[in-house]
């Protein structure tokens, strides 16, 4: 888990030093996702260290969603950040207030009940498909991990082996105590998602040193004995 701590330290470094970013909506939006990624990674790491990896996978699912969303947004850094900030998220007027403060513009008037509008008509898979041109392989990765993580989030029966163990004699053991099961694979995926998110954050104009994150990603996969790329039979 030392490698994951190294990733978290690298992710926090620009936050500790004070964010440096371009004066654009894309960079502003990316900085929000960077903070969220750092917080979620810290929470996933804490849960895995204390034996709650299946629960950490619910947070990992949120990290995957953010990775896909930001990757899609980065395909059109001029328009999509504004759509994200001004449409669906008008339910949160603080977003536009933060943007105004960041860019030195006049503070917008708050609306008591801002109108809800979708910022994109694309499905989640549709966003991932569009993001392929900036993050090759993101759609296949999403198809590989997202159903598993959704099982954890929604408690589907296919995830029941994480909560109950049935023995040949009919004995049922409730698995309610912490254990180290699935910690390594959870952290491996969390680091991969973090690297991709950080790379997109940098592409949108936020200063992030990707070197330590990339190195830690390789080390954690080596330590787990896992390939960094999807096996060919899963990538087809």
Feature map (PLM): residue ranges:
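A cross-kingdom marker of C-terminal helix-rich interaction/assembly modules
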Residues: 1-236
């Amino acid at each position: 888990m030392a490698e994951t701590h190294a990733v978290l330290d690298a992710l926090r470094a620009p936050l500790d030093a004070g964010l440096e970013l371009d004066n654009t909506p894309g960079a502003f939006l990316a900085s929000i996702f960077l903070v969220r990624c750092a917080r979620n990674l810290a929470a996933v790491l804490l849960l895995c260290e204390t034996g709650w990896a299946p629960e950490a996978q619910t947070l990992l699912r949120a990290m995957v969603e953010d990775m896909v969303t930001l990757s899609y947004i980065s395909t059109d850094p001029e328009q999509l950040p504004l759509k994200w900030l001004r449409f669906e998220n008008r339910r949160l007027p603080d977003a536009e207030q933060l943007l105004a403060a960041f860019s030195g513009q006049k503070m917008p008037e708050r609306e008591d009940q801002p109108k809800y509008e979708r910022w994109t008509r694309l499905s989640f898979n549709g966003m991932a498909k569009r993001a392929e041109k900036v993050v090759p392989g993101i759609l296949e990765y999403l198809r590989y991990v997202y159903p598993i993580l959704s099982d954890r989030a929604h408690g589907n029966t296919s995830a029941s082996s994480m909560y109950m163990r049935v023995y040949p004699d009919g004995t049922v053991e409730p698995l309610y105590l912490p254990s180290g099961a699935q910690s390594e694979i959870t952290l491996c995926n969390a680091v991969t998602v973090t690297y991709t998110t950080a790379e997109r954050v940098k592409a949108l104009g936020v200063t992030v040193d990707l070197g330590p994150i990339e190195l830690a990603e390789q080390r954690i996969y080596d330590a787990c004995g896992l390939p960094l790329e999807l096996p060919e039979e899963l990538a087809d």
